[in-house]
């Protein structure tokens, strides 16, 4: 009924990503899955419609991939050793991968602290091997987090350079004004670009 959609609205207005009750294992709580069932189904369908012509992830730098949240079957192919999941609204089965969840609302720009946390997690997960950073489409939330890592690791000198790196790999990346403002706010502590631009080392 309509009240279920109102719960989604409350998440955006009051509760934030926590309202989806996504746990550290990647699954939404049973209560959230029941309360939000129509919205969750719509989110899955929307993700499929937007990415059906290009479902595959793209390698931004060696060992670092950007894409939509994969299905269990897609994760089982062994391409990745680690997954950073930026969705709040979609459940995920990590399939034994090194997994971290950083739930973010769709259509809402991450804040600076989200971006800093993501950069730490990306460094941590890259040590495990090939890493996929994912959101529902792989175009905005996850792209913003990877851009933040590029900036904070010195692999990009400024926001436009970071966006250019992303779009060379994944042309559909879309970072709006709000996302760019967040990334620009990181610039005060961004180091000089690395001499080894583009190189990602694994432990």
Positions of predicted regions on the chain:
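N-terminal membrane-anchoring alpha-helices
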Residues: 1-51
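Short, electropositive, low-hydrophobicity segments enriched in small/polar residues
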Residues: 20, 71, 142
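Cytochrome P450 heme-iron axial ligand motif
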Residues: 132-145
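Long, low-complexity, intrinsically disordered segments
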Residues: 197-203
